[in-house]
């Protein structure tokens, strides 16, 4: 089956320029133009509320071991729900807008973009809530079973997202750092790590590279989104506003990304939640191009 992806003349004007791509390559992040209409961001809010109320178009056939999946029994903490592009068609309809994939393809300098994961996030306006603080990390640590270094994430707030709402914060240029050693505890999710340990890791890696830690909270206007490289350190602070911060982290893979065996020091291999869900390739490996879970968002061939 051949998929056709096309942009309107208006959408083509919204693609990153050569200067934007150069900025992304140097800094490891890029704040987009307005890619979603106000109607689309309104629909993201409405669809997310239906999702939180229990609406699903389909459910995962099994719960992978590291699945993030908030439900009301967990209380008024920061909510993370994975695979919303699979489970909820209302959210998927907007997340699968070809323009998002085309922007990502320009930044990653690739011809094809597939969804890797989508996580619905709700950060409540609760002063002092510890789960609202996201410590420093970069995504590729959790994607060690992927062989690509072109992967990237679109952080998509459903509203204007200023620093007081706990917007995403980039460590500028950190995607170009070399890592210290091979401490493979980094493959554990930040929710399972000590925050001070992650702060120390950031400082040590910066020092190793002779770099300064430059933390940039990104003010994101409604309808815009912030793209970051899979090796860019990032985190987010408290929501000290009077309203919830609603967003989706849309994780994206280039068309060449494949599963790889990544041995860990404890004798196991790195795994990702897809490994329990996706079909297998002819040689028995998890297929990160399975269209059920990793649909193509953009292809320009």
Regions found by a protein language model. Give the residues of each.
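Feature marks short, surface-exposed loop/turn motifs that line or immediately flank catalytic pockets
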Residues: 124, 162, 177, 254-256
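A short beta-loop-beta micro-motif enriched in histidine and acidic residues
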Residues: 108, 139-151, 213, 220, ...
